[in-house]
């Protein structure tokens, strides 16, 4: 009951605010001229700053970009690769040879290090023999690795076999 009392009855608007009178009032009003100080600021601002997009017509902006102008990311990447290849070709042959030699030297430098590392490990094992527990752990890890490798090979072989079976069954039909 309290809610019903609090609600206001919608009253119709007075007759003076009818639809036609609203339209007539809007049409009769004249636009007010801007203040002279405001106009001078706007004019000076527009003279000082001309945006390039403002010079374009709206129609030009709405035109879709032609497919010739659009570049796919793949084309852009391929152009970059071509440019980099041209740069490499433009380099003097001495620079290319130097780079190749440096790469070869790095590979050669690693081989003695690997050999030395293996020799050092063997020497360390001879000097400090492993305890039974450590050797047992190493053997267990080696067995696990071997079993994983065998399992992968079995899976690979079974997949290849299943593919061959599928091909044979397709040929039979």
Swiss-Prot record:
Transmembrane segments: none annotated. Residues 17-41 have a biased composition (Polar residues). It comes from the Eukaryota. Residues 1-173 are annotated as: Disordered. Residues 1-11, 56-109, 120-144, 157-173 have a biased composition (Basic and acidic residues). Residues 145-156 have a biased composition (Basic residues). This is Uncharacterized protein T15H9.5.
